[in-house]
């Protein structure tokens, strides 16, 4: 899914559209679909489209905002993704790692407003960290700072989507949570989500969190396990 918003120079949210259906894939068709969704959203805005000065695309994985290259998704062209999208959309386009963008948003207007040094942990389907040092977002030499989830931390033989085995993300992320839930259910444990698993319905993190709010013992135990794994590595 996609979330799209428009903000002004003060950081005020002018308009938004949340939970837009989108199938994320490393294909030209998926990229064209992304551009189409953005163009459709722009047409619905009450403001003059000429006032749009920049479109910033936040995506997961390895992103170098300075060069405009994405190395994890939409990386099939031998030129910057920002340049490709600029041609498709007709606006200036920049790209940024999604976790770093969240970090900066929290820094400007969120719970850490006013702090100078921040570590922001984003646990979603994957796992990432955003870093602010002396009030400035830290990207690292190559623009990849914060790829915490791909530190090899376990001898578990679980293949990560990055191609390596044993990444922290394989034991402490949303995808790890869903995988472990399905494994334990297959071994005979019961959850409020068991029927959905057997029917092969896709599960989301929201489903698991909703189950914990209904005192689902297995989901509570899994979230505690994920939290312990994550906490140990952040502290270490």
Where are these regions (language model features)?
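ATP-binding/phosphotransfer module of carbohydrate and carboxylate kinases, centering on a glycine-rich
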Residues: 1-51, 89, 155-159, 164-236
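Short, acidic Gly/Pro/Ser/Thr-rich loop/turn segments
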Residues: 2, 62-64, 128
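Short, acidic, Ser/Thr-enriched surface-loop or helix-capping motifs
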Residues: 8, 65, 132
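Glycine-rich phosphate-binding loop and adjoining helix at the ATP-binding site
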Residues: 14-117
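Short beta->alpha linker loops
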Residues: 97-99, 143, 225
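Glycine-rich phosphate-binding loop of actin/hexokinase-like ATP-binding domains
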Residues: 114-172
């Amino acid at each position: 899914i996609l979330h799209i918003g428009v903000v002004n120079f003060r950081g005020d949210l002018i308009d938004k559209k949340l939970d837009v259906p989108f199938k994320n894939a490393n294909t030209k068709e998926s990229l064209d679909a992304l551009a189409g969704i953005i163009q459709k959203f722009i047409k619905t805005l009450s403001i003059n489209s000429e006032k749009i000065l920049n479109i910033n695309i936040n995506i997961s994985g390895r992103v170098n905002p300075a060069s405009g290259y994405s190395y994890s998704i939409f990386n099939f062209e031998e030129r910057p993704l920002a340049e490709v999208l600029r041609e498709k959309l007709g606006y200036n386009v920049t790209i940024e790692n999604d976790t770093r963008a969240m970090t900066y948003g929290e820094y400007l207007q969120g719970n850490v407003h006013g702090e100078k040094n921040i570590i922001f942990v984003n646990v979603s389907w994957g796992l990432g960290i955003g870093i602010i040092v002396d009030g400035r977002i830290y990207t690292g030499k190559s623009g990849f700072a914060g790829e915490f989830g791909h530190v090899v931390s376990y001898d578990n033989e679980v293949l990560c989507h990055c191609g390596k085995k044993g990444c922290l993300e394989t034991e402490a992320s949303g995808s790890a949570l869903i995988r472990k839930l399905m494994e334990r259910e297959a071994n005979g444990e019961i959850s409020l989500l068991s029927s959905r698993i057997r029917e092969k319905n896709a599960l989301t993190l929201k489903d698991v969190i909703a189950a914990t709010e209904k005192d689902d013992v297995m989901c509570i135990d899994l979230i505690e396990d994920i939290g312990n794994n994550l906490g140990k590595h952040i502290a270490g």
